[in-house]
Design a protein with these regions (language model features):
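Bilobed "Venus flytrap"/periplasmic-binding protein-like clamshell domains
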Residues: 2, 35, 56-107, 124-126, ...
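Acidic, polar ligand-binding/catalytic clefts
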Residues: 7-72, 135-139, 143-146
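Short, Asp-centered acidic motifs that coordinate Mg2+ and/or phosphate
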Residues: 28-29, 118-119, 152
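Periplasmic-binding protein-like
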Residues: 52-59, 128-171, 189-197
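Ligand-binding clefts/hinges and TM-proximal coupling segments of bilobed small-molecule sensing domains
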Residues: 85-100, 139-143, 170-197
Length: 197
């Protein structure tokens, strides 16, 4: 916001609403672990990538021996956050699975803890935060081929000037180590805040 010379206004919304708000002109920049897919590039522009992350599956610890490879999830019930790369990945790679798509990751975590889904497909960084304060859950050994995805900031289509400024800020903060520092710091804060609930 400082580099653009504008006042920062943060709006918290679910992922699907965020993308709709961006394409509808209600927000100028969306930063929420957004993967710049070819489909999304049709309706919005993206900055340079700033955060690579692997896609993982969270399961209940008691099921640790049941879900070791992707095929073990075929035909099972799998939870995802709605309108995400993880939703598309689960639909594409987990054959005959019943996909449960919910607006927020905590809702899917609750479904998993209650036994309503067998696994949760999530970004590794996000999933790691939930594992810290849910000691009954774990990452499975399931691996998705070519599952490392990168996040980028999304802007309204045709806003090349904003993309250029965002790219400058990304480069500066990658080069000086801030992204790594921020990821560590805010992951820790997320865990601390969750522990208070």
């Amino acid at each position: 916001a400082d580099e653009l010379g504008v006042k920062l206004e943060v709006q918290d919304m679910n992922f699907q609403a965020l993308l709709t708000s961006l394409t509808g002109g209600k927000v100028d920049i969306a930063i929420a672990g957004i993967n710049p897919t070819e489909e999304r590039k049709k309706s919005m522009d993206f900055s340079a990538d700033y955060l690579p992350t692997e896609q993982k599956v969270i399961i209940r610890k008691e099921d640790g021996s049941r879900y070791k490879k992707l095929e073990d999830l075929f035909g099972k019930t799998v939870g995802v956050q709605k309108s995400t790369t993880q939703e598309a990945l689960a639909k594409e790679k987990i054959k005959d699975a019943k996909i449960v798509s919910l607006a927020h990751v905590p809702e899917v975590v609750l479904e998993l803890k209650q036994g309503k889904v067998d696994g949760l497909v999530v970004e590794g960084i996000v999933g790691g935060q939930y594992l810290v304060f849910n000691d009954d859950l774990m990452f499975s050994e399931v691996e998705f081929p070519n599952s490392v995805k990168s996040s980028a900031a999304a802007v309204q289509k045709g806003n090349e000037d904003v993309v250029a400024v965002v790219n400058k800020v990304i480069k500066e903060n990658t080069d000086n180590g801030n992204f790594k520092k921020w990821t560590d710091e805010y992951s820790r804060k997320a865990v601390e805040n969750a522990d208070k609930q």
